[in-house]
Design a protein with these regions (language model features):
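Alpha-helical transmembrane segments and terminal signal-anchor/GPI-anchor hydrophobic tails
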Residues: 245-255
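Alpha-helical transmembrane segments of multi-pass inner-membrane proteins
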Residues: 126-154, 168-245
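Transmembrane helix-loop junctions and nearby membrane-interface residues
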Residues: 18-28, 73, 77-84, 141-151, ...
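Interfacial loop-to-transmembrane-helix boundary motif in multi-pass membrane proteins
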Residues: 6-10, 61-70, 104, 110-154
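Juxtamembrane membrane-water interface segments that cap and precede transmembrane helices
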Residues: 18-27, 89, 164-180
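N-terminal hydrophobic segments of proteins, predominantly signal-anchor/transmembrane helices
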Residues: 6-25, 40-108
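Membrane-embedded alpha-helical segments of multi-pass membrane proteins
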Residues: 31-51, 96-108, 187-195, 229-236
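Structural signal for the C-terminal ends of transmembrane alpha-helices
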Residues: 43-56, 111-122, 198-204, 236-247
């Protein structure tokens, strides 16, 4: 059976996002998020193998911004103090390489979304991505309630920012949800963008109102002020954009 090229691109995107959500794990001392970011670079050979057409894609001024950020990063790399933080698990060269890869991967994700928009509807793309948020939220809730239900928690293979692994009962002075991440705040910030996506999808399918409970509960249990503020700001921005679009439509109708 012939594999459609858009399915390959979609699989790479979703796998990358999922691996980014497994922040607390590594294999052969390589963190899963690093694999996730590196997977996006597979788009480059895939582009040549399947001869993707880029003529219809419009990156506008984004490519110039990416070039600027890359230039600043490389220049600063030579003038920065080479001493890494005490609990850093990577060398300075690895840190710079990962940062450059992150910047390039951002550009690749924008390209992927534009490419997929030629084959899938906007709602389909959002739904695929939203399911990743639901899966990570379920895993985080399992980890959190494993303490109460005496279930085995995940065997995390990466240390937290304090330099030691964090069993859930001592994650903080109060029990906090950090799920598949090394810190509760990391989980909170990662979860926030998925909540508006759930409510967007709920406009046409009520099941997303139910599914939105999972990332919201996961966020609340992190007890992260940063995460709560982030979701409030995100919802405010979404509401503002919606109101502006509605107002614009009404003005166009009047005139």
């Amino acid at each position: 059976m012939k594999i459609k090229k858009q399915n390959i691109v979609l699989s790479i995107l979703l796998s990358s996002i999922f691996l980014e959500g497994l922040d607390a794990f590594s294999i052969f001392a390589v963190p899963f998020p690093w694999f996730g970011v590196s997977m996006l670079l597979l788009i480059i050979p895939t582009y040549y193998v399947f001869n993707f057409d880029l003529t219809s894609l419009n990156f506008g001024s984004l490519k110039y911004w990416i070039l600027y950020v890359l230039t600043v990063t490389i220049i600063k790399a030579f003038s920065f103090d080479l001493e890494m933080p005490q609990y850093a698990t990577s060398t300075y060269s690895q840190f710079i390489s990962l940062r450059v890869t992150k910047i390039i991967s951002f550009f690749i994700v924008v390209w992927i979304i534009q490419f997929l928009a030629s084959y899938l509807t906007k709602d389909q793309i959002i739904e695929y991505i939203a399911y990743i948020g639901v899966i990570i939220s379920v895993l985080s809730l399992y980890s959190y309630f494993s303490f109460f239900l005496d279930f085995p928690d995940f065997n995390r293979t990466r240390a937290g920012s304090g330099g030691w692994s964090q069993p859930i009962q001592r994650a903080c002075s109060v029990l906090r949800n950090y799920g598949t991440f090394r810190e509760p705040s990391f989980l909170a910030v990662w979860t926030v963008p998925f909540i508006p996506l759930n409510f967007y999808l709920a406009r046409k399918n009520n099941k997303w109102y139910f599914l939105s409970i999972l990332p919201i509960l996961s966020l609340i249990l992190t007890r992260s002020l940063t995460g709560v503020i982030s979701v409030l700001v995100a919802c405010l921005v979404v509401l503002l954009v919606y109101l502006l679009k509605t107002k614009k439509l009404k003005l166009n109708f009047v005139y």
